Amino acid sequence: MRNLAVFGTASDVGKSVVATALCRIFSNAGLDVAPFKAQNMSNNSGVTPDGLEMGRAQIVQAEAARVVPTADMNPVLLKPNTDTGAQVVLQGKAVANRSARDYFGNTEVWAEAAFESLERLTGRHDLVVIEGAGSCAEMNLYDRDFVNFRTAKEADAPVILVADIDRGGVFAQVAGTLSVIPPEDRARVKGVIINRFRGDSVLFDDGIRILEELSGVPVLGVIPYFRGIHIEAEDAVPLQAVVDPAASPDPGKISIAIVYFPHISNFTDFAVFDLLDDAEVHYLHHPKDLADYDAVILPGSKNVRGDLDWMIFMGWKERLAEYRKRGGIIAGICGGYQMLGISVADPHGLEGEPGETSGLGLLPVHTLLKKEKQLFNAKGCLFDDTIPVEGYEIHMGETRLTGKASPLLQLTARNNRHSSDTDGVISHDEKVFGTYFHGIFDGSAFRGWFLGKLRPDSAVNDTITEKDTEYNRLAEHFLSHLNMGKVYEIIGRGK
């Protein structure tokens, strides 16, 4: 059995979704398949069962493949924390902050670790679906790019090239990519997938013929643009998300406003709300009258003090204070929780210049950023209650309660070890709360508690069932439009 690589003509052409679909298709066919991406750049990350950090996109692909996610599936994770720099997570552990220039100055250390992980994966699974990064033909970085063709060569993997017809110029995308890469890499490209087609695909039959004549590579499928299949986005708030809407929230739905920080992270915490027919989420850059929203959530941030400064500059502090006075419900997750407090101190300069920044003052807590990152899968229940909660923690802050409020959660386990710690804080009137738990809304019990505070008649879906259903729907969509017989031929397995 050969491995298979999915590369793109550009960023955001749909590589992650194609890889996710293939993982579920191969899994449904009875194959032991695993995902792999040598290097991912994203602030959406999760924690593996053994307490290591990896990109959410590969966790999603592992779920689609029905395998336990491991850090080997995403050995290098870059988490941008400034416009020109990022925290480097190597095989699940944060090792350094690097500027782009420093990182690309010597990529061999990262490549070596990535290929170690790849070797372990290929030894454990029948098939590895490899996702590339960005464009596979960035010629100015080609000699330092270990994520695309160098990984394909290491895995002896044929390549499927994904192009996005929705953005236009699909012929130039494919022909241009294939014309600039070296002949030995071009020879690895065995098929093309045209993604996000709108309209009657029969009208593109001539386009398929022209593409195949131009490239000498078969078109394996034309995948129609789809809506209504909910798969977590990889590294940006999805384009279909409602950002800064001119219209007010729908009064017939539960309306949740999420503050869209410049350095927002783990916005996938809120993907579950997209599965609720009677809920809508608005991502807001700009402050507005919040009176019509049932709740406001401050998400995670990869630069808490920087985003705090941004919020104050934009006028968010005053808007949230007004909303609080009117009895609005405000929640903070991880970095958002830290912002709700009195202050955030960074004496080591982990996220910028050393110093301390005043918070929003909505919870009586102080946060100190420390050098060691905390990575936990955790379980517990609401404090003084039996409502179960699960989530994962990824933070470098230690937050102390210093005033009149109560812990939000009573923990029972962290990384499968007993814990009697508490997490988070909730105000005495239960209108403002914060927690370090990412994924907390995925649990139906906690989600029901939260939605019940907003509107008592809120319906609750089962997230796990929904997720599996969505992966199967995605696989069915691709199976209807993809020549899987040719794909199996490409990987050396007749079907």
Curated annotation (Swiss-Prot):
Pathway: Cofactor biosynthesis; adenosylcobalamin biosynthesis
Gene3D superfamilies referenced in this protein's UniProt entry, alphabetically: 3.40.50.880, P-loop containing nucleotide triphosphate hydrolases (3.40.50.300)
Residues at the active site: C334 (nucleophile), H438
Listed InterPro entries: Class_I_gatase-like, CobQ/CobB/MinD/ParA_Nub-bd_dom, CobQ_GATase1, CobQ_N, CobQ_synth, GATase_3, P-loop_NTPase
Sequence ranges assigned to domain GATase cobBQ-type in this UniProt record: 253-446
Keyword presence, Ion transport: no
Classification via Pfam families: CbiA, GATase_3
GO molecular function, one term: ABC-type vitamin B12 transporter activity
Keywords: Cobalamin biosynthesis, Glutamine amidotransferase
Role description: Catalyzes amidations at positions B, D, E, and G on adenosylcobyrinic A,C-diamide. NH(2) groups are provided by glutamine, and one molecule of ATP is hydrogenolyzed for each amidation.
Family from the record: Belongs to the CobB/CobQ family. CobQ subfamily.
Entry-linked NCBIfam families: cobQ, PRK00784.1
HAMAP family assigned: CobQ
Protein name per the record: Cobyric acid synthase
Gene: cobQ
